[in-house]
């Protein structure tokens, strides 16, 4: 009886993980298709940027990425500083994300695989198809799946390089060269956002 019960629990867990993984790759493909359609539309770059920001707000865990990139420095912030950082990081992230992506016209991304890491994370594998201007690029998406009804992008790993980790290192460098003063990072974020 105990073996049968354990078998049922194991199969249930396995099926739950398969459903989460399926949702994660469908989520990525849907997000990619949405962005690709927008980028191929005959609208101004400014309009594309605004629409890309909306897509990012719907699909990316901006706050989670923001506090990850702050690293252990977040422990030193009071509540007001955390709120200010979250606001400034969101502005920074949205501008960086949308202005870079707006340069692409009709990017073709194929989602081809996935790996459930645990109940909270799934890695979705894809490639950005090659064109005459660029080679094929491997992109892995780290999807936060704790809430399967609303998966969120937590990181992109492009050709093995984590964008979130790279951002974390850049922010650590700014803080390190300014004696850990969060105001220096705030200023850096503001300057980028106001360009």
Model-derived regions: residue spans:
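Sec-dependent signal peptide recognition
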Residues: 2-11
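Surface-exposed, charged secondary-structure patches
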Residues: 95-137, 188, 192-195
